[in-house]
A protein has these predicted regions:
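Beta-rich carbohydrate-recognition and catalytic domains
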Residues: 1-53, 58-104, 119-159
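Short hydrophobic/aromatic beta-strand or adjacent loop that forms the aromatic wall/cage
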Residues: 109-111
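Hydrophobic, well-ordered secondary-structure elements that form the walls
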Residues: 114
């Protein structure tokens, strides 16, 4: 969603599914229009379709947005110049994930995220040519325990 004025509810615009944020919202209690025709659309061109969670940072080496998420097989990355069009997912870090885990498999991971401790941005939302991949690794056959580790793996990014 986008707006130029946070205080003005009528100025908010949502993604319409095209190439811009041009969908206006309506008040379902005061308007006679169909509220379903004014919903924010999803980005259906992100692949693989089952990639989940993760982190979104701007990579200062590739000059693109870098999304790291998880899917069967491990942690994946996608790149985008504009947050609309995305590259196909590439395997970033092979690992077992929780939703296809069975006892006896390698310990699964969740929540992959990139953080560059040298980032000068306020929220560490930029990544340069080196960063760390953080993730949670679960133990004990995914029983309801707190037996898990926060793991940090150094990475290098080249153009």
């Amino acid at each position: 969603m986008r707006t130029l004025d946070l205080a003005d509810p009528t100025s908010w615009r949502a993604w319409s599914g095209g190439h811009s944020f041009d969908m206006s919202f309506i008040d379902p209690y005061r308007s006679h229009g169909d509220p379903n025709a004014h919903l924010c659309r999803t980005l259906d061109n992100i692949s693989p379709g089952d990639i989940q969670g993760g982190s979104l940072t701007y990579n200062t080496v590739a000059h693109q947005w870098l999304w790291v998420g998880q899917s069967i097989g491990g942690a994946y990355f996608l790149l985008s110049p504009d947050l609309i069009d995305w590259t196909p997912g590439g395997l970033f870090f092979p690992a077992q994930v929780t939703w296809d885990f069975q006892c006896g498999d390698k310990d699964p991971i969740e929540y992959p995220s990139l953080i560059d401790p040298t980032s000068t941005s306020r929220n560490f939302d930029t990544v340069g040519n080196t960063a760390y991949l953080y993730f949670t690794q679960f133990h004990s056959c995914l029983e309801d325990t707190l037996d898990r580790d926060l793991v940090r793996v150094p990475i290098s990014i080249t153009k």
